Amino acid sequence: MKAVLFAVAALLAVCIPISAKQCNVNPVNIPKGWITMQQSCRGSMRRQIQTEVGASLQYLAMGAHFSRDGINRPGFAKLFFDAASEEREHAMKLIDYLLMRGELETDVTSLIQIRAPERKSWESGVDALEHALKMETEVTKSIRSVIIACESDPKFNDYHLVDYLTGEFLEEQYKGQRDLAGKASTLKKMLDRHSSLGEFLFDKKLLGMDI
């Protein structure tokens, strides 16, 4: 208990209240020699974080679209809401990596700029799946551009980050693209055979139901 009180007292001692939610803490002088990420690589990583956040918001819009009472496709809604969470997790992983490398010492609010989703409605499940596939392809290209920027800098080839992005992100991207392409192909075949009923049946399949 005494340790907790001491910690609180120490925090109050260094915090000068500006408002009910803010305090000033004098910066400390820490050696910078361990911070080695180059500007081109750092900038690419920051842009990738925004790309992942944008993809997450787009998937949220897609999930909300298929949740509407007039559309009511819970399988598609779940697919896209899950994808939104996955993209948000990707952004968090990239932020964690920058923190580990000492690249986020000051205000980090510039990392996340909220922009309206590119689209807010889709004509069909096929339209949505093909849009998702196109979006994932663009995300993959963006990750590859980060890798190129981080491994081609003449001052510092960032092997560790390149290996992290290649193993942690690229493989998942390629598997995700293949999965979306397969889903779109299957749905088109079901529509050819069962007409509009095909999308209803496919939606149930997305929920794990037997059809």
UniProtKB/Swiss-Prot annotation:
Gene Ontology, cellular component aspect: extracellular region; Golgi apparatus
Major site of localization recorded for this protein: Golgi
EC number: 1.16.3.1
CDD domains: Euk_Ferritin
EC top class named in words: oxidoreductase
Compartmental location: Golgi apparatus; Secreted
Annotated Ferritin-like diiron domain residues: 35-191
Keywords: Disulfide bond, Golgi apparatus, Iron, Iron storage, Metal-binding, Oxidoreductase, Secreted, Signal
Endpoints of the signal sequence: 1-20
A single GO BP: intracellular iron ion homeostasis
Amino-acid positions noted as binding Fe cation 2 in the UniProt annotation, renumbered to this chain: 87, 136, 173
UniProt family annotation: Belongs to the ferritin family.
The protein's name in its UniProt record: Ferritin heavy chain
